[in-house]
A protein has these predicted regions:
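Thiol/disulfide oxidoreductase modules built on the thioredoxin-like
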Residues: 67-73
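Acidic beta-strand-to-loop metal/phosphate-binding motif
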Residues: 20, 76-80
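Non-catalytic, surface beta->alpha helical segment in thiol-disulfide oxidoreductase systems
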Residues: 79-107
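Local sequence-structure signature of Cys/Sec-based thiol-disulfide redox active-site neighborhoods
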Residues: 9-47
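TIR-domain catalytic/interaction hotspot
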Residues: 6, 62-64
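N-terminal organelle transit peptides
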Residues: 1-4, 107
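Thiol-based oxidoreductase modules, predominantly thioredoxin-like and allied folds used
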Residues: 45-62
Length: 107
């Protein structure tokens, strides 16, 4: 495992809710990353509880996360160490209520 893959693995395993995104939660740099943040907010997740990684600040992470997850696009959501998907999958799961259950925010 490369140093980059180890860094990613450590982040995934140590974070309850982790989002690899372009930009930051307060200033997303792409529409899909912004949508991912909005979905998490709509689920009732405290923004401070979400660990975000701005892949635009680290090219090794930006490329490495795609290899780590075998998923070609960003954003990427991980919950309790498990890869969930990108913003389209997040939206589908939100609409079905599955994402809220996974995050423990279901009413």
């Amino acid at each position: 495992m490369s140093d980059t893959q180890k860094r990613i693995d450590d982040l995934v395993k140590s974070s309850e809710v982790l989002l690899f995104m372009k930009g930051t939660a307060s200033f997303p740099q792409c529409g899909f990353s912004g949508r991912a943040i909005q979905i998490l907010k709509a689920c009732g997740v405290d923004p401070k509880a979400v660990v975000t990684v701005n892949v635009l600040e680290d090219d090794a992470i930006r490329q490495g996360i795609k290899e780590y997850s075998h998923w070609p696009t960003i954003p990427q959501l991980y919950v309790k160490g498990e890869f969930i998907g990108g913003s389209d999958i997040m939206m589908e799961m939100y609409e079905s209520g599955e994402l809220q259950q996974l995050l423990g925010t279901a009413e």
